[in-house]
């Protein structure tokens, strides 16, 4: 299990992981790593939250929120934000399904993708600022948001098909079973309940699950399935929805 965790941490983040810690794990077994997603999210969110707490006293809430969101993006290499931008460029192009998928493969940033990045990043900064003004624990909120968003991404993998012939998303999409999905969601729920007691965290997770499930169905209808880009979009939007649900 530890080898699987380190392999997943290296796969979906840019955090330094000694190669020997994940050596010997076949790429075809990576789908089993879905159950580690909430734990990885917990780690990323905690680091981002610590950055916020350290900077808040020095430069104020808005700038602390800005840098915490920036650090979160840097730790993932902008991987999920890139998926969000590509998904919006493709889906909102109003072209045929095949053309949408081609646009999503294009490395150039389009208008819809640019707008999505601006709105999502700005919304996160504003929500974190508002949560601070309301006295919510930011470290716990960010840790829970990142754990839940990565856990609920399993809803776009279970019983979904991969929309392309090949790609990184094919490692997970359509490859995880019901037990893995339940364990992943269960871990995310436990983290949310422990970090944000009083059912506040669990209620926010339920809202996030509903939103991501609906997103998955809409993308399935539009694209004929899911891709690595849509998983990234789901994670980014899941973080935002969870934080909004805490207001």
From Swiss-Prot:
Keywords per UniProt = Cell inner membrane, Cell membrane, Cobalamin biosynthesis, Magnesium, Membrane, Transferase, Transmembrane, Transmembrane helix
Q: List the disulfide bonds.
A: none
Membrane-crossing segments per the record: 34-54, 59-79, 113-133, 138-158, 194-214
Q: Where in the cell is it found?
A: Cell inner membrane
Q: How does it sit in the membrane?
A: Multi-pass membrane protein
Q: Does the UniProt entry include the keyword Transmembrane helix?
A: yes
Gene that this sequence comes from: cobS
The EC category is transferase
| Pfam families referenced in this protein's UniProt entry, alphabetically | CobS (PF02654)
Q: What is its EC number?
A: 2.7.8.26
Which InterPro entries is this protein grouped with? CobS
Q: Which GO terms describe its biological process?
A: cobalamin biosynthetic process
Q: Which species is this UniProt entry from?
A: Escherichia coli O127:H6 (strain E2348/69 / EPEC)
Tell me which cofactor or cofactors this protein depends on: Mg(2+)
Family from the record: Belongs to the CobS family.
Q: Which domain of life is it from?
A: Bacteria
Function of the protein: Joins adenosylcobinamide-GDP and alpha-ribazole to generate adenosylcobalamin (Ado-cobalamin). Also synthesizes adenosylcobalamin 5'-phosphate from adenosylcobinamide-GDP and alpha-ribazole 5'-phosphate.
Which lineage is the organism of this entry classified under, starting from the top rank?
Bacteria, Pseudomonadati, Pseudomonadota, Gammaproteobacteria, Enterobacterales
List the GO terms this entry assigns under cellular component, sorted alphabetically. Answer: plasma membrane
Q: Which reaction does it catalyse?
A: alpha-ribazole + adenosylcob(III)inamide-GDP = adenosylcob(III)alamin + GMP + H(+); alpha-ribazole 5'-phosphate + adenosylcob(III)inamide-GDP = adenosylcob(III)alamin 5'-phosphate + GMP + H(+)
* Annotated protein name in UniProt: Adenosylcobinamide-GDP ribazoletransferase
Pathway(s): Cofactor biosynthesis; adenosylcobalamin biosynthesis; adenosylcobalamin from cob(II)yrinate a,c-diamide: step 7/7
* Entry GO MF terms: adenosylcobinamide-GDP ribazoletransferase activity; cobalamin 5'-phosphate synthase activity
